[in-house]
Amino acid sequence: MLDIQLLRSNTAAVAERLARRGYDFDTARFDALEERRKSVQVKTEELQASRNSISKQIGALKGQGKHEEAQAAMDQVAQIKTDLEQAAADLDAVQKELDAWLLSIPNLPHESVPPGKDETENVEVRKVGTPREFDFEIKDHVDLGEPLGLDFEGGAKLSGARFTVMRGQIARLHRALAQFMLDTHTLQHGYTEHYTPYIVDDTTLQGTGQLPKFAEDLFHVTRGGDETKTTQYLIPTAEVTLTNTVAGSIIPSEQLPLKLTAHSPCFRSEAGSYGKDTRGLIRQHQFDKVEMVQIVHPEKSYGALEEMVGHAENILKALELPYRVITLCTGDMGFSAAKTYDLEVWVPAQNTYREISSCSNCEDFQARRMKARFKDENGKNRLVHTLNGSGLAVGRTLVAVLENHQNADGSINIPAALQPYMGGVTKLEVK
């Protein structure tokens, strides 16, 4: 959520920054709401002053034996009380309308974010590793994976399109990848491992920005036997739960930064993705991801963003996968982000790079929604900055390992860093 004080003091500047990311901020609507709010507040202050003045007169009138005048004054105070209750209701209505609107407004882009309308104008930062040249006809991960235990028909039979069953060697490799990622982040990068719920309420999703704007992207659930039919949601990412662990908290500054990680399934309806990536694991309704979250001092958040990107890169380097880092332009950033880097891994069968990690600094946007604060060196409570990043998407990493490390006979070389997690197995072979 944007800072309302910033909006009030620099409305035009905020509107201009939002326009950079393609959001048309309705300045006239905001001004009208502010005028209503101010009008009600002025009226409230006038009524309170009148009530206080008349209340002081009542005692004096009674002392002078002017009982009729005292009663009239008391009647006035009673009417003012009614008027104040109405003014409070009017102010509450204005505030609720303003708050609901603020929840739908995206974050302001950082000044370093390149301008652009969509993904075609993202800016490449660097490429790492050289895509392998194959001397045989390569296969995609579907053709490679199915003989090794990747079962798309089985997933469709159980749950419909965009679900997958893994068994045997592929299931083990998938598990090994997640375990390797967790160990790297906890043992080398200083993150604390968490296990968090996969079902959350609307307040939690509002805190990180998925609600109210992106409800159609979520899976909704209701509890059996719950007559109220309260809606809950399957998490789209562990960012939601990890970040919300500090909701409503005041963190001592010496405890910052907090570095959190979790391996979880992620559930997404892919409402706007009809017809995209219908083959294979690239776009699924259910997929696993190892998530990184940092809760940091505001002055250190952009250093933390670069660090987090490096942590995701270390996984790709260890798995010997070519990749590139890009800065998302203003028109391609996520709702809550002030700046985002995407890591894209080379996918040989598609002859292109595909997103495998997204690392974002949300500054105080999520913290304001969650009321997540820290106590600074002067004892003042201030909003923290929150960051999140994929470290990595496990299914897409599986795709990259299969395709980049394939052999002519359909076998898959296991990267050295992953072999301890595979019981020393160095190659997956069709049996």
UniProtKB/Swiss-Prot annotation:
Keywords: Aminoacyl-tRNA synthetase, ATP-binding, Cytoplasm, Ligase, Nucleotide-binding, Protein biosynthesis. GO terms for molecular function: ATP binding; serine-tRNA ligase activity. SUPFAM superfamilies: Class II aaRS and biotin synthetases (SSF55681), tRNA-binding arm (SSF46589). Its main location: cytoplasm. InterPro entries: aa-tRNA-synt_IIb, aa-tRNA-synth_II, aa-tRNA-synth_II/BPL/LPL, Ser-tRNA-ligase_type_1, Ser-tRNA-synth_1_N, SerRS_1_N_sf, SerRS_core, tRNA-bd_arm. Homodimer. The tRNA molecule binds across the dimer. PANTHER family: SERINE--TRNA LIGASE (PTHR43697:SF1), SERYL-TRNA SYNTHETASE (PTHR43697). This is Serine--tRNA ligase. The gene is serS.
